[in-house]
Regions:
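Amphipathic alpha-helical segments used for helix-helix packing
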Residues: 86, 99-124
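Amphipathic alpha-helical packing segments from all-alpha helical-bundle domains
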Residues: 67-74, 100, 117-135
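Hydrophobic alpha-helical connector segments
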Residues: 74-106
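N-terminal intrinsically disordered/low-complexity leader segments
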Residues: 1-10, 17
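Helix-turn-helix
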Residues: 14, 18, 22-56, 60
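Alpha-helical transmembrane segments of multi-pass integral membrane proteins
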Residues: 59, 63, 92, 124-125
Length: 135
């Protein structure tokens, strides 16, 4: 990976981290792109260039988190033989995901309070995949 690609990945990571913080604090409707840009240390145009509009940003934040959660669950379930081991692996995955993504619980609580109206379809698919893994 060259220096330009490294800077691009770092910029996107900062944008996604800042967006997760903003969505946790204010919800989808209350989060402002200007605030996210300030938190990330970029101008607003960089967000639109790298990610897109606020809906695309929200989708990307949640899709990344739930993709990570699914990968953790799959890895933790790999060696779980008994139902008891599977429950432990599932709980471990939840705790690991929350530890890595501390903004997830407030974002999801706000989403549930809003009736899921802002939950992107791709994220609903991610959740279904996670549920399918444990079923």
């Amino acid at each position: 990976m060259n220096a330009r690609e490294t800077r691009k990945k770092e910029t996107i990571r900062r944008i996604l981290d800042a967006a997760a913080q903003a969505f946790a604090a204010a919800g989808f409707e209350g989060a402002r792109m200007d605030d996210i840009a300030n938190r990330a240390g970029v101008n607003k145009a960089m967000i639109y260039y790298h990610i897109g509009d606020k809906r695309a940003l929200y989708t990307e934040v949640l899709h990344n988190i739930f993709g990570d959660a699914a990968a953790r669950l799959t890895a933790n379930l790999e060696h779980a033989a008994s139902p008891n081991d599977k429950i432990k692996a599932y709980l471990r995955s939840i705790f690991e995901t929350i530890e890595r993504h501390p903004h997830l619980p407030p974002v999801m609580m706000r989403e549930m309070a809003a009736g899921g109206v802002n939950l992107p379809e791709i994220v609903a698919g991610d959740l279904a995949s996670i549920i399918g893994t444990i079923a």
